[in-house]
Amino acid sequence: MATRMGTGVGKGEASWECGREAAQAALAEIGPAARPDLVIVFASPRYDHEAVLKGIRSVTGQAPLIGCSSAGEFTERGVSSQSVVVAALSSDAMRFAVGCGRGLRQNLSRAVEDAVSGFRGASPESLKAGLVNRTILLFADGLGGGGEALIDELMVRTALQYELAGGAAGDDAKFQKTPVFYLDDVLTDAFVCAEILSTTPLGLGISHGWSPIGPTMRVTRSEGLVVKQINGRPALDIYREFARQQGVTLEGDAVVPFLMEHIIGWIYQEGDQKLRVTLWPLEDGSIVCASEVPEGALIRLMKATDRSVIETSGRASRLALERLQSAPLAGMIALECVSQRLRVGEAGVAQQLQQIQDVVGPTPLAGCHGYGQLARTRGTFTGLMSASALVCAFPRA
């Protein structure tokens, strides 16, 4: 039994043709006789996403499809901007099912219930076939917030039987619309997911390159993506005081770059932080973050170097390969944070890709930059992370 993965890239002005071009290239790599069992799509917001999906489906037919809008795409061939990337998986060693949860803000519990209703991980047929390793690959609207709650609800609905790996959709750092893709549909306020059942574990790895600086503080007021107060003071005042200690006057155009270089680390267990990218200030001194920081959370400010950010991708890849337990590699999905791309630029992103390839060699790879990474990996991490790299490695057998 074997699993094969192929990738393709589409570029140009015409959305339908870009989707078709990427899908044709991906299917050519898995072989002319193979049919795709799962199609994964990352597409720049420059395109008409409905037309992109029609172009892809003109090639892949009714194969299960999930994906999301992105903020930069890449494959093993190199880094691309404003493109369409398609990954196609064909396997007689894995079983796939896809689901969709709509209306996350209105009824999260119902959305998750709908999405996983067709999953078969605990069925007698799956157990008899030896498909005892269960993974959910998911993509969520990147502007909807609630990533932590989504992971928690998925864990409850699936009785902690699955590892989770995925990302929050992006839109080239415009922060306007971040849809997800399900079969023929382009959806907001939704998440999409694929159940992956396998005899061999998938390799999941997540890593970041940030270190805490300064004292531990408490978020005393927050609402959704907005941190209003830290230690009882406006959040921006805390940053201004910290900046003065670094010899920086935090005013005008200096504010946003300083926030992006000193993000929040939410202390979720001793010695570990869930990263939250700080984006921009509001007039009342609040700070908008890329993902939620709960009221009452203990936090520290975080700092990184360009080199530590670039090396994150290689570390995540090594962790993923360790989880494969020496199984041969069929291909990888890599999910990076747009904050990394904004920090290190296109040249740095190319170095990140090289970091992955230095670890895994010339293997099929599809990835994108988005607005956060979603994960549940046994013994390491559960929840939503920003400014990080997440890798999902598919075993060949």
Language model: regions and residue ranges:
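Small-residue-enriched flexible segments
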Residues: 1-38, 42-64, 68-363, 368-397
